[in-house]
Design a protein with these regions (language model features):
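Transmembrane helix-bundle core of multi-pass membrane transporters
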Residues: 144-261
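Inter-helical junctions in multi-pass inner-membrane proteins, predominant
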Residues: 42-52, 151, 234-247, 258-262, ...
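Loop-to-transmembrane alpha-helix initiation sites
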Residues: 56, 131, 159-161, 177-188, ...
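Transmembrane alpha-helical segments in multi-pass inner-membrane proteins
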Residues: 295-308, 312-375
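Alpha-helical transmembrane segments within multi-pass membrane transporters and channels
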Residues: 99-140, 352
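Cytosolic-side transmembrane-helix boundaries in multi-pass membrane proteins
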Residues: 1-32, 154, 192-223, 286-289, ...
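Membrane-helix/interface signature in polytopic inner-membrane proteins
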Residues: 199-214, 255-295
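Single transmembrane alpha-helix segments in multi-pass membrane proteins
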Residues: 31-39, 43-98, 120-132, 147, ...
Length: 394
């Protein structure tokens, strides 16, 4: 009997050791949230704070999605923070100073983001300037343009309700007498069903072609953990005003990029170039065009990030964009994007974003000095990357 218990215990230990990497991010996120829930005196899981967490994370999550593509291709974009700040300022100037319709202003800003991506992508792929140098120069340029654009006015307060609702509004509810936001509950249940369906389908496809998959017990445990996170968050939000529009925007962008990377030739080309660019080129892949797309995509998403940040603050400020790129890069790497390129998922980058922003949010609740916040985030970042590097070597 004792030997049987030891055998069972060692089997569980082996399963955890062999498969923990697959769900480490989710486990870390849950532990961080529980830690701050306890040490903040129950403030972390208050509906108002979870809503605030979503709005805090939205602009970083959008950047992390785009950054994942760049990092998979073994490049980097250091300019995205101030591209976001600059485009947010342009949106505010167009609306408040020149009276441009808010939706037209958003479209113009997205086009500006596209042009920035074309400019930087051309320098990298056509001229041959390294991405690090190109985007570092871009960081200086767009920081200067942000300062110039707000030099005369300073902070510009935004009053357009539609624009502000992007990061301050909530999805409409279905009338009911329960006291809960019913639409949020329904979306949560549908989201869980979609996650289970997609994960099971993905697992079966991998098994069909004899790819490695996690063991069945760990797979089921992972599904339970992910489903529990989604349902708990949705129930908490449903007890207040429901899902914020910022979460919907991030969700739509996430769905688009998940489809792009997993279901299209372009996605396969991105992974192929990141894994071995010479082999991809010999196979007929236009790696310059693919990389150009990634930089254009990144800058457009930076513009979206700038819009969300300006909406959240109800203003455009000269300090907008500061260190955004650091949070985006950290989120992507914490989410499991390989330092060597060729590996990464945008869904995991979102989890990485919530790990970073949950740390920030929780430490703010506990009134931790900003200096210590940077130290803690740095330690978590290097620990996550070190864990990933060691796991890949094994």
């Amino acid at each position: 009997m004792e030997n049987k218990k030891q055998s069972t215990g060692s089997e569980i230990g082996r399963l955890l050791k062999d498969n923990i990497k697959s769900y480490m991010m989710y486990i870390a996120l849950v532990l961080i949230m529980l830690f701050f829930q306890i040490w903040s005196g129950g403030k972390f899981f208050k509906p108002s704070n979870i809503t605030n967490l979503f709005n805090q994370a939205a602009y970083v999550a959008v950047l992390a999605i785009g950054m994942t593509l760049i990092l998979i291709l073994k490049h980097i974009d250091l300019s995205v923070g101030y591209v976001a700040g600059f485009t947010g300022a342009i949106a505010a100037i167009l609306m408040q100073t020149h009276g441009v319709n808010q939706w037209l202003a958003i479209l113009i800003v997205l086009l500006i983001g596209l042009l920035i991506g074309l400019y930087q992508g051309t320098l990298v792929m056509r001229v041959g300037v390294p991405a690090f140098v190109t985007t570092l120069a871009g960081m200086f340029i767009f920081r200067g343009l942000l300062s110039l654009s707000l030099a005369k006015t300073g902070t510009i307060v935004i009053s357009q309700k539609g624009f502000l609702s992007l990061c301050q509004g909530f999805i409409p509810d279905i009338p009911n007498g329960t006291g809960y936001h019913l639409a949020t509950i329904i979306i949560g249940v549908v989201a869980v069903a979609l996650v289970i369906y997609s994960q099971v389908k993905s697992r079966r496809n991998k098994q069909k072609y004899d790819f490695d998959v996690v063991s069945t017990p760990i797979f089921i445990a992972g599904l339970v953990l992910i489903s529990a996170i989604i349902l708990v968050v949705c129930v908490v939000l449903a007890s207040d005003k429901g899902i914020p529009w910022s979460a919907v925007i991030v969700g739509v962008i996430l769905a688009i990029y998940t489809f792009l990377l997993s279901k299209t030739k372009l996605g396969r080309y991105i992974y192929g170039i990141g894994g071995n660019d010479q082999a991809a080129e010999l196979s007929g892949v236009d790696f310059k065009l693919v990389t150009q797309f990634a930089f254009c995509s990144m800058s457009v998403l930076a513009a979206v990030s700038g819009i969300l940040y300006a909406s959240r603050l109800s203003s455009a400020t000269p300090t907008a964009g500061n260190a955004f790129e650091m949070d985006a890069i950290a989120s992507s790497y914490i989410g499991g994007t390989a330092v060597s390129g060729g590996v990464g998922k945008v869904t995991n980058a979102i989890i990485g974003t919530f790990v970073i922003m949950s740390l920030t949010n929780g430490m703010n609740l506990m009134s931790v000095d900003i200096s210590y916040q940077y130290i803690v985030k740095g330690i978590i970042f290097i620990a996550a990357v070190a864990f990933d590097v060691r796991a890949r070597k094994k």
